[in-house]
């Protein structure tokens, strides 16, 4: 077995209150390995608002600023301005929000920060629903998902919002997807974002939630890997809003990923076929954008 090239240093304490198999805690661990100790983390209301611990306790070895649900982008912008006034250009400001605080409630503040091209790293750890408050659907929840607000036959009938494309349309220096199942790729992307210094860098991190997805905790990383291998969650980068690079190409059917999760148990073969068509369509668009950027 090949040993992964992952830094040994850790900036998380043992004993946090994340659920067993929580993808969001794995994501934070890898992110801080890349960013280092000169990092301040801005956290709005989300799962990580609880996992971080009540003041003055903390599960992280770096400073944390907790803020309101809708304000991660604005708070990170203000923190960056304060550090600049002090002449501190070395400290990295990282906003760390869930999909609810990014795709929905926080999108206005995020778009404002991005339009100003603030010198921050904004991370969405995406577990595809409002998990902290009881597994309610968000606009990051994929088509076909059963949640507490899309129960029974009322499962979600709309597609997932594409946040990377929305952020890329702002022409920011760097936007990328990452997954807890590919730690080396994820760490390299965070290191790249840290080195860039200047302008907004956005990372969309796929973070499984055993509780909300109705999966065994020990399957958390494997299912995250299946999402990439089936092109349900492709790994790619966008530079300056126009230059696309695909990091990994999937090869498995989407049903391999869907059928192992309780939140999709109600779907029929026809539903799986419909979802496969959606995945193929999105993958085709991504391939086209990548091809065009390579020719230009």
Segments predicted by a language model, with ranges:
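Structural signal for hydrophobic packing residues in well-ordered secondary-structure cores
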Residues: 32-39, 80-83, 158, 168-171, ...
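Glycine/aspartate-rich loop-and-adjacent alpha/beta segment that forms the canonical ThDP
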Residues: 186-296
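Basic/polar N-terminal segments that are highly enriched at the extreme N-terminus
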Residues: 1-4, 294-296
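Cofactor-binding active-site loop characterized by glycine-rich and histidine/acidic residues
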Residues: 2-122, 135, 139-143, 156, ...
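Short, conserved beta-strand edge motifs with alternating hydrophobic and charged residues
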Residues: 124, 176-178, 202-206
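Short gly/pro/ser/thr-enriched loop/turn and capping motifs at secondary-structure boundaries
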Residues: 48-50, 127-132, 210-212
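Electropositive phosphate-/nucleotide-binding environments in soluble metabolic enzymes
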Residues: 9, 21-25, 69-73, 157, ...
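Conserved thiamine diphosphate
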Residues: 3-6, 15, 88-89, 138-192, ...
């Amino acid at each position: 077995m090949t040993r992964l090239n992952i830094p040994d240093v850790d900036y998380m304490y043992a004993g946090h209150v994340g659920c067993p198999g929580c993808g969001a805690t794995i994501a934070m661990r890898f992110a801080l390995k890349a960013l280092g100790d000169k990092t301040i983390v801005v956290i709005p209301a989300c799962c990580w608002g609880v996992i971080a611990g009540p003041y003055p306790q903390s599960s992280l070895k770096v400073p944390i600023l907790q803020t309101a649900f809708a304000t991660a982008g604005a708070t990170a912008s203000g923190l960056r301005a304060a550090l600049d006034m002090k002449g501190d250009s070395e400290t990295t400001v990282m906003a760390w929000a869930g999909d609810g605080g990014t795709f929905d409630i926080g999108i206005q503040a995020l778009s404002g920060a991005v339009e100003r091209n603030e010198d921050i790293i904004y991370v969405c750890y995406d577990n595809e629903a409002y998990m902290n408050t009881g597994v309610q659907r968000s606009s990051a929840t994929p088509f076909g998902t059963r949640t507490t607000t899309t129960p029974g036959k009322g499962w979600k009938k709309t597609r997932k919002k594409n946040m990377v494309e929305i952020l890329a349309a702002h022409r920011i220096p760097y936007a990328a997807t990452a997954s807890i199942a590919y730690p080396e790729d994820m760490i390299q992307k965070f290191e790249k974002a840290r080195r860039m210094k200047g302008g907004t860098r956005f990372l969309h991190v796929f973070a499984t939630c055993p509780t909300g997805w109705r999966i065994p905790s020990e399957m958390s990383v494997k299912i995250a890997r299946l999402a990439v291998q089936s092109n349900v969650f492709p790994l790619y980068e966008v530079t300056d809003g126009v230059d696309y690079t695909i990091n990994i190409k999937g090869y498995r059917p989407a049903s391999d990923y869907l059928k192992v999760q309780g939140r999709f148990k109600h779907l029929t073969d026809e539903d799986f076929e419909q979802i496969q068509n959606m995945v193929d369509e999105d993958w085709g668009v991504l391939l086209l954008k990548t091809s065009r950027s390579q020719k230009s």
